[in-house]
Amino acid sequence: MKMFNNIKNTGKLIRLERIFDKKSEKTVIIPMDHGVSSGPVAGLKDMRTAINSVAEGGANSVLVHKGIVRHGHRGYGKDIGLIIHLSAGTGVSPDPNEKVIVTSVEEAIRMGADAVSVHVNMGAPTDCQMYQDLGKIAETCEYWGMPLIAMMYPRGEKITDEKDPEFVAHAARLGAELGADIIKTNYTGDIDSFKDVVKGCPAPIIIAGGAKSTDAEYLQMVKDSIEAGGAGVASGRNVFQHKDVIGITKATAMVVHENADVEEALKVIKK
């Protein structure tokens, strides 16, 4: 895949092909790590059903914590990639923006992971520790041939707007500078400003799915991010909390991989 031409580690390249579409060179990831931060939220009470639904809808990968792997493993149907999240923090913590490492790269390898992810909140009181963690994990991932996704969010006292293009561009570049292979971050809200974010980051960028919105608004955001040079989407609540999980996953994949119009993609969602 051309976007990963700068990666020479064969192990990373083989694993990346399991979470990216080889033709479009883009990805649809469904994060399902919310149980740690928020508890068993709607849509994720039955993890096996949730994972089965997005797999049947054509998602490239799910992203979960280590304890969920055994509960969501699929022995049938469509293949789906596995990304194991290494960071944790809860919404009831004294500092919800603090993330600590709870899983090792080696443990993720033993579980069959195709990639690992780390969460960093740029601007949080403990952000320097998160930077250190990311840098160390990047070194370990390079050694083992494990792709690393950095979830890079501008969040903290000095962050006036988490979607501000300058903050988003800084967060994305920070993740790439510290060794991440793929960056997940906020969409800035318009194509031109996100183009600048993509231009300033040497690693491919996928956008977060954002807050719950209408199907049309969500799919338009995804389409705009792709037009701006994004490499896909990692969408949680807009997918797994949908009344037609399979349909919205299919629609997302159509926009990301087939460059479908929003109106066309909306037709596959059951009303």
Curated annotation (Swiss-Prot):
UniProt xrefs under Pfam families: DeoC
Q: Per the record's keyword annotation, is Amino-acid biosynthesis included, yes or no?
A: yes
Q: What is its EC number?
A: 2.2.1.10
Q: Which residues form the active site?
A: 33, 153, 184
Record bears the keyword Cell division: no
Q: Which reaction does it catalyse?
A: 1-deoxy-D-threo-hexo-2,5-diulose 6-phosphate + L-aspartate 4-semialdehyde = 2,3-dioxopropyl phosphate + 2-amino-2,3,7-trideoxy-D-lyxo-hept-6-ulosonate
Q: Which UniProt keywords apply?
A: Amino-acid biosynthesis, Aromatic amino acid biosynthesis, Schiff base, Transferase
InterPro entries reported in the protein's UniProt record: ADH_synthase, Aldolase_TIM, DeoC/FbaB/LacD_aldolase, DeoC/FbaB_aldolase, FbaB-like
CDD domains (alphabetical): DhnA
Annotated 1-deoxy-D-threo-hexo-2,5-diulose 6-phosphate binding sites:
33-37, 153-155, 209-210, 236-237
Q: Which GO terms describe its molecular function?
A: fructose-bisphosphate aldolase activity; hydro-lyase activity; transketolase or transaldolase activity
Where on the tree of life does the source sit, at the highest rank?
Answer: Archaea
Q: Which family does it belong to?
A: Belongs to the DeoC/FbaB aldolase family. ADHS subfamily.
| Subunit text | Homodecamer.
Summarize the protein's role: Catalyzes a transaldol reaction between 6-deoxy-5-ketofructose 1-phosphate (DKFP) and L-aspartate semialdehyde (ASA) with an elimination of hydroxypyruvaldehyde phosphate to yield 2-amino-3,7-dideoxy-D-threo-hept-6-ulosonate (ADH). Plays a key role in an alternative pathway of the biosynthesis of 3-dehydroquinate (DHQ), which is involved in the canonical pathway for the biosynthesis of aromatic amino acids.
The protein's matches in PANTHER family, at most eight in alphabetical order, are given as: 3-HYDROXY-5-PHOSPHONOOXYPENTANE-2,4-DIONE THIOLASE, FRUCTOSE-BISPHOSPHATE ALDOLASE CLASS 1
- NCBIfam families from the xrefs? ADH_synth, PRK07226.1
Name of the molecule in the record: 2-amino-3,7-dideoxy-D-threo-hept-6-ulosonate synthase
